[in-house]
Amino acid sequence: MVVSLKGRDLLCLQDYTPEEIWTILETAKMFKIWQKIGKPHRLLEGKTLAMIFQKPSTRTRVSFEVAMAHLGGHALYLNAQDLQLRRGETIADTARVLSRYVDAIMARVYAHKDVEDLAKYASVPVINGLSDFSHPCQALADYMTIWEKKGTIKGVKVVYVGDGNNVCHSLMIAGTKLGADVVVATPEGYEPDKKVIKWAEQNAAESGGSFELLHDPVKAVKDADVIYTDVWASMGQEAEAEERRKIFRPFQVNKDLVKHAKSDYMFMHCLPAHRGEEVTDDVIDSPNSVVWDEAENRLHAQKAVLALLLGGVKTGF
C-alpha cells in the first residue's frame, strides 16, 4: 500500500495510523542503510526548516540540523531571543510569517498548545520536537531501535519505569499502535494522562498488543524485553526536583531491578540521563544498554519524517 504523508503535521503519534508509522520506520531504515554505504540522499535540495527552541536541546538541534544537511536542505535555528514572541507577537502571526519563508517548522516548546497553534496557523508542515504532552520523534527512534534489535515490535514487552511524562505518552501511543505489550510503572499520583491511557487501551485492542499501568516496578519489569526510563524532573520542574527524588527512588533502574527482566533485555533512555538518579552506571553502561544506538536513530527517524512530510520520497519502494 502506498502511503503519502506529504503536507502533514507531526504533533502526536495518535494522529497517525500504524501503516503511516511503519512507513516512517521503513524510510528511516532505508536512510540509515544509505548513509552507511555512502549513498547520497539529497532529496530536499533548496528546502529550509525553521527550528524554534523554547527549550534548549543537544540531540534535537544537532539531529535536525544534520538531517537537513544530509537531505540537501538547510536548518535555521531560532531561540526565544530571535523571535518576537517575547515582545507580544502572537504564535499565530509567527506561524503565518515563517510559512512565507520556510518549507517546514520544527518546534520544541513547553506547552503542547503552542505547537498546536503553530500547526493551526502555519501553511507548512509543523513537527513537534518536544512538548509537555508528547515527544513523537523520540518514540519513532525508540521503536526503530527495538525493531532493529529484536527483529519485531509486535509482542515485545516494553516497560517504562518512572514519571508518566511526555516521553512516556509517546512510547505508550506508538507501542500500542504497533502491537507491543506496553507496561508503565509510576508512583501513585504520577501516572500518564488519562486521555493517553484510554488511547493506549484502544490502540492495543485494535493492534493485538496490550497495555497495563502498575505502581510496582518489580512486577512491571518481570520478563521485560525492554526497560525504559527518563529523568524524574523534566525541564521546568526544577522546583520539584528534591521532592521527586524521594518519591521516585524506589523506581530507580538498577542491577537489582533489571535482574527480574529477561537476560537479553534492552535498556533504553531518551537522554540526557541523570546517572545515579533514575538509572545507575552499571545499567546504562552495560552490554544491555542501547542508548547510543537509540540516540543515533533520532537522526534517521527525523530524516524520514522530514522527507515524507516535505514530499522528498515516494513510499511503496
Swiss-Prot record:
Class in the EC hierarchy, top level: transferase
Where, by residue number, does carbamoyl phosphate bind? 57-60, 84, 108, 135-138, 270-271, 298
Give any single GO term for biological process: L-arginine biosynthetic process
- Any idea which UniProt keywords this protein has? Amino-acid biosynthesis, Arginine biosynthesis, Cytoplasm, Transferase
Keyword NADP set for record = no
The enzyme's E.C. designation: 2.1.3.3
InterPro entries from the UniProt entry: Asp/Orn_carbamoyltranf_P-bd (IPR006132), Asp/Orn_carbamoylTrfase (IPR006130), Asp/Orn_carbamoylTrfase_sf (IPR036901), Asp_carbamoyltransf_Asp/Orn-bd (IPR006131), Orn/put_carbamltrans (IPR002292), OTCase_ArgI (IPR024904)
Q: List the disulfide bonds.
A: none
Q: Which domain of life is it from?
A: Archaea
Look up the record and name the pathway of this protein. Amino-acid biosynthesis; L-arginine biosynthesis; L-arginine from L-ornithine and carbamoyl phosphate: step 1/3
Query: Could you say which residues bind L-ornithine here?
Result: 166, 230, 234-235
> A Pfam family in this protein?
OTCace
Q: Does the keyword RNA-binding apply?
A: no
**Where, subcellularly, is it found?**
Cytoplasm
> Quaternary state and partners of this protein?
Homododecamer.
Q: What does the UniProt record say this protein does?
A: Reversibly catalyzes the transfer of the carbamoyl group from carbamoyl phosphate (CP) to the N(epsilon) atom of ornithine (ORN) to produce L-citrulline.
Family to which the UniProt record says this protein belongs: Belongs to the aspartate/ornithine carbamoyltransferase superfamily. OTCase family.
Q: List the HAMAP family.
A: OTCase (MF_01109)
Q: What is the protein named?
A: Ornithine carbamoyltransferase
Q: Which organism is it from?
A: Pyrococcus horikoshii (strain ATCC 700860 / DSM 12428 / JCM 9974 / NBRC 100139 / OT-3)
Organism classification: Archaea, Methanobacteriati, Methanobacteriota, Thermococci, Thermococcales
